[in-house]
């Protein structure tokens, strides 16, 4: 009997400890994530929209991208991912136009990582229209078609909408990720004891925000800020 009582007490303590640990790992408002005010209407329909705000010119985005690609392979099935390039300075406009032109030509998957490497490993200055057009031609893309799309009103309009979207979401840095038009976070918000980005924990926060948007009871208290 004594053994059973001790075992029962141990189980209760274990459950309490696990519950406390789980609660401690819930994302904290204004620390691990922020609210989008006012909430924005996603473009994903029934699925939960997850947006990465990025720039090919951003070295942190280049470093973050391999971990993002790993997460994309295991992301929840009801999460629909898309990328939105930011233009925080004039030199970022050409890389933003490059992204949308690659998207229009169906070449993002093939050349996405190559753009990052060209800028951040090979020190290619892809910050002017001509530099981008010449680089694209060297990657085997039809130069005339690329240039026509790159300089089109449609691509300019997409860049303008991307900039407006970033402002509406309150995005202040890249990389950042938004969930469901209601929450946004970034690796620089989810840090370890030394102040470095905790990427495993960051993607856990993204998963939890997706769960919150989905409305799972387990995530109901996640939006409460700790006192």
Segments from the language model and where they lie:
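C-terminal cap of thioredoxin/glutaredoxin-like
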Residues: 3, 139-227
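Extracytoplasmic/secreted envelope proteins and their assembly/folding machinery
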Residues: 65-72, 95-99, 112, 129, ...
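Solvent-exposed loop/turn segments at secondary-structure junctions
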Residues: 56-60, 87-91, 117-122, 152-155, ...
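Structural microenvironment flanking redox-active thiols in thiol-disulfide oxidoreductases
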Residues: 74-105, 109-137
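Extracytoplasmic thiol/disulfide redox context detector
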Residues: 2-93, 207-227
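A short, structure-level motif marking secondary-structure boundaries and short turns
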Residues: 54, 83-84, 116-119, 147-148, ...
């Amino acid at each position: 009997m004594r053994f059973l009582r001790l075992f029962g007490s141990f189980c209760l303590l274990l459950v309490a400890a696990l519950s406390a640990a789980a609660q401690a790992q819930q994302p904290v408002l204004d620390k691990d994530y922020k609210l989008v005010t006012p909430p924005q209407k996603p473009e994903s329909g029934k699925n939960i929209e997850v947006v990465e705000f990025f720039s090919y010119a951003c070295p942190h985005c280049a470093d973050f991208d391999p971990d993002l690609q790993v997460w994309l392979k295991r992301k929840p099935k009801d999460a629909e991912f898309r990328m939105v390039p930011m233009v925080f300075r004039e030199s970022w406009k050409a890389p933003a136009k490059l992204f949308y032109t690659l998207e229009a030509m169906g070449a993002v998957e093939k050349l996405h990582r190559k753009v990052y490497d060209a800028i951040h490993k090979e020190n290619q200055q892809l910050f002017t229209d001509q530099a981008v057009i010449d680089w694209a031609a060297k990657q085997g893309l039809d130069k005339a078609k690329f240039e026509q799309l790159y300089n089109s009103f449609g691509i300019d309009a997409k860049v303008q909408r991307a900039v407006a979207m970033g402002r509406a979401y309150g995005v202040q840095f890249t990389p950042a990720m938004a969930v469901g038009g209601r929450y946004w976070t970034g690796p620089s918000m989810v840090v370890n004891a030394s102040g470095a980005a905790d990427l495993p924990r960051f993607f856990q926060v993204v998963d939890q925000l997706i769960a919150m948007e989905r409305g799972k009871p387990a995530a109901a208290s996640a939006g409460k800020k700790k006192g």
